[in-house]
Amino acid sequence: MQRPADPVRVPSAPVALSSASVYPESAASAFEYASRLGYDAVEVMVGIDPVSRDFEAIRHLSEYHAIPVCAIHAPCLLITQRVWGTEPWGKLKRSAEMARSLGAKTIVVHPPFRWQRDYARAFVPGIADLEAESGIAFAVENMYPWRASRRELQAYVPSWDPVGQDYANVTIDLSHSSVSHSDPIQMVEALGPRLRHVHMTVLNDSAKDELLFLLF
């Protein structure tokens, strides 16, 4: 019987609960669960939940439950296209304001959709400019090709894979790497110190992007 690989230990890395993991419950539930289950922090997914967009409400939840906010996930999903307006750079600047007000050091952002042409054209240098202006890490997340029947659709520009792009900070999502059939270990090794943030999940050989509630 093959001996299991030794676990990778990162003592200084906090383990956070994403508010997306408790959907359709609200961000308030994420803070409650994080406190009860012993998480170190919360990642706030800014979305259709009004609480997730309210700086003061999130600050109150963080203080009440004594759980810090470690990251803000910018509203860049299909279902959040109108959250904080429709201008992509405005959304990211608003995310930086929220992160700064809550003491979060990381903003998770997806690469642009192909139809966001002007945004996509300036995305790589624009992210670097935002980091320089704000002092906050904008960690671009790995995505995956969209599949329709037997065809693959490249929905993200410049790429769904951030490893080969000139980003200073990257988020690796293990659910996304599973859907794209990417080797996350190779991605981590290729990124080196550019790896800023990791989205954990329980992989179950599904072709769907799934964030599961993790109990540690």
Q: Language-model features: where?
A:
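Acidic/histidine-rich catalytic cores of soluble enzymes
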Residues: A41-V42, L130-F216
